[in-house]
Every structure is written in structure tokens, then in C-alpha cells.
């Protein structure tokens, strides 16, 4: 996180991970530098968090969420970096999550980082996701060929 000069979105699958990440980031960078956005985030606070994160002048630099809650339907283009602390096996959730920072209006290049250790379930999940991407690309390529 210290190496990112811009804002960052961090996705974690489990609530305990989100809570621990928020605590650690707040201790290192200050309370106002981080916000979490997940199932336990009150509905009336959610838009305020997004608006504050999207404000270039805001001290809020780190937006932590899970893909189920923060991975769809919101724009987070103030971030140029997205970190996947953990993943699920759901490729659609992953693709949707990536698109939160890679949208119309994004003028920065986007960097995606997966935190994965060798010989862990996280490595197997990432391999599974990459396999699904390959299959999806092959199927879509075949469909496109039908219309040529």
C-alpha cells in the first residue's frame, strides 16, 4: 500500500478479513484513510462512503469491500489500483469487481494485484479463475466466428 500513490480498492471474501484489514490500515495510515463497505455497512452510509472515496480531495484512500457487496453497480474510478486479498470461485464476481475501477471516466491505467501464497487454497482458486477465463474466451471466440 505504501507503494501506491493513488487510491486503492481492496477486495476480501470474508468479513473477518475486511475488519482486520480495515483495522491494520487505520493503524498504519490513520482512521480517515480507510472505509469498509460490506454486508454490515448500514445502507444509509454506503453512498456517503462511495462519494467520499470518489472525491479527489478526500483523505479516504482505501476502500475495502467484498465482491458480493462492492463488486457491482458502483463506480470507484478514483482508484487506479485494485488488490484482491482473497477470491471466490465465481468468475462473474471477479470480472464485475475489476470493472469498478475500469469504467468510462477512468483516466488512469488500472493495476490489479492478487495476494497469493504458493500451495494454498488461494492459489487453487486463482488457477480455477484463470481456467474459466480461458474457457470463456474460447467459447466467445467460437460464437463470434458464427457471425462472420
Name each region found by the language model.
Residues 1-3, 52-57, 74-76:
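Conserved catalytic network of the ASCE P-loop NTPase/AAA+ motor domain
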Amino acid at each position: 500500500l505504501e507503494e501506491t500513490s493513488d487510491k486503492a480498492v481492496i477486495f476480501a471474501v470474508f468479513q473477518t478479513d475486511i475488519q482486520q484489514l480495515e483495522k491494520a490500515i487505520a493503524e498504519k495510515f490513520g482512521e480517515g484513510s480507510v472505509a469498509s463497505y460490506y454486508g454490515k455497512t448500514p445502507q444509509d452510509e454506503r453512498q456517503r462512503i462511495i462519494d467520499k472515496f470518489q472525491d479527489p480531495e478526500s483523505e479516504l484512500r482505501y476502500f475495502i469491500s467484498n465482491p458480493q457487496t462492492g463488486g457491482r453497480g458502483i463506480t470507484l474510478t478514483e482508484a487506479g489500483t485494485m488488490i484482491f486479498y482473497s477470491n471466490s470461485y465465481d468468475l462473474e464476481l471477479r470480472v464485475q469487481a475489476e470493472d469498478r475501477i475500469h469504467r468510462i471516466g477512468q483516466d488512469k491505467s488500472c493495476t490489479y494485484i492478487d495476494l497469493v501464497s504458493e500451495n494454498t487454497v488461494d492459489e487453487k482458486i486463482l488457477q480455477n479463475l484463470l481456467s474459466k477465463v480461458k474457457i470463456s474466451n474460447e467459447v466467445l471466440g467460437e460464437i463470434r466466428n458464427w457471425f462472420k
